Amino acid sequence: MNGSNMANTSPSVKSKEDQGLSGHDEKENPFAEYMWMENEEDFNRQVEEELQEQDFLDRCFQEMLDEEDQDWFIPSRDLPQAMGQLQQQLNGLSVSEGHDSEDILSKSNLNPDAKEFIPGEKY
């Protein structure tokens, strides 16, 4: 091709290859490929609301777990140190089998002729 042929070609005429690369005709909206950005603010607002909602739920669950943790009685945490030592001493105690059952019955203040107690039954 010589220079005279190139000069006769008008710049406004595009080949099919050029139209394929840009994705649209000159008759179409030149900003068509950017139309997705039209709703970008709505999308961002929606994502931000979802993140705030998730953060709120996380904080609620953490607060609920903290309250539940406070409700539980944990001796090592809730008892003073002296009480903890007393608790250890009580855990070390055991009932001895050295007492004779006759000895216990002779010192008892219970009525041996009383009916046997059955819960829920009226006498």
From Swiss-Prot:
Compositional bias of kind Polar residues: 1-13
Quaternary context: Interacts (via central acidic portion and C-terminus) with PABPC1 (via the second and third RRM domains and the C-terminus).
Region (Disordered): 1-30, 91-123
Biased composition (Basic and acidic residues): 14-30, 113-123
PTM sites of type N-acetylmethionine: M1
InterPro entries documented for this protein: PAIP2-like (IPR040396), PAM2_motif (IPR009818)
Phylogenetic lineage: Eukaryota, Metazoa, Chordata, Craniata, Vertebrata
Keywords (A to Z) from UniProt: Acetylation, Repressor, Translation regulation, Ubl conjugation
Biological source species: Homo sapiens (Human)
Purpose: Inhibits translation of capped and polyadenylated mRNAs by displacing PABPC1 from the poly(A) tail.
Protein family per UniProt: Belongs to the PAIP2 family.
Single GO BP term: negative regulation of translation
Tissue expression pattern: Expressed in brain, cervix, heart, liver, ovary, kidney, prostate and testis.
Post-translational modification note: Ubiquitinated in vitro.
Superkingdom of this protein's organism: Eukaryota
Protein name per the record: Polyadenylate-binding protein-interacting protein 2B
Gene Ontology cellular-component terms listed: cytoplasm
KW Ubl conjugation (keyword) present: yes
GO molecular function annotation: mRNA regulatory element binding translation repressor activity; translation repressor activity
